[in-house]
Regions:
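Short beta-strand->loop micro-motif that forms the acidic, two-metal-ion catalytic signature
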Residues: 43-47
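Glycine-rich beta-strand-to-loop/alpha-helix junction loops that act as flexible
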Residues: 28-30
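Catalytic core of pol beta-like nucleotidyltransferases
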Residues: 1-24, 33-38, 49-107
Length: 107
């Protein structure tokens, strides 16, 4: 992964992690697995508290990132409970839980 992508990820983590209720941020997809191509985007899964609405959380995350994106970015938001349940099945969440890169975890 290039230094510019690492810096961009650090910036995204710093911005997203300031939002209330953010528990974890995972990197998945081509950048996580070392296979980015010319047209690759950055794929992030954000796990939020069960009390939050994932759609509203997605809106707030995108508002935080306005003007701070230089690489295409795809964000998926899951409630903690939903992520935990889905990670036990043959789903993208299981793939992320098993092979994704945990970039942030709330203390």
């Amino acid at each position: 992964m290039s230094e510019s992508i690492k810096k961009e990820l650090d910036k995204y983590i710093a911005l997203i992690s300031t939002l209330s209720g953010v528990l974890q941020i995972y990197l998945f997809g081509s950048y996580a697995y070392g296979e980015p191509g010319e047209y690759s985007d950055i794929d992030l899964l954000v796990v939020v508290e069960d009390s939050l609405d994932p759609i509203n959380a997605t809106v707030k995350i995108n508002q935080k990132l306005v003007g701070n994106r230089t690489t295409p970015l795809d964000i998926v938001v899951n409630r903690k409970k939903d992520f935990s349940i889905a990670a036990k099945e043959n789903t993208i969440q299981k793939y992320i839980s098993d092979s994704g890169v945990l970039l942030y975890e709330a203390s």
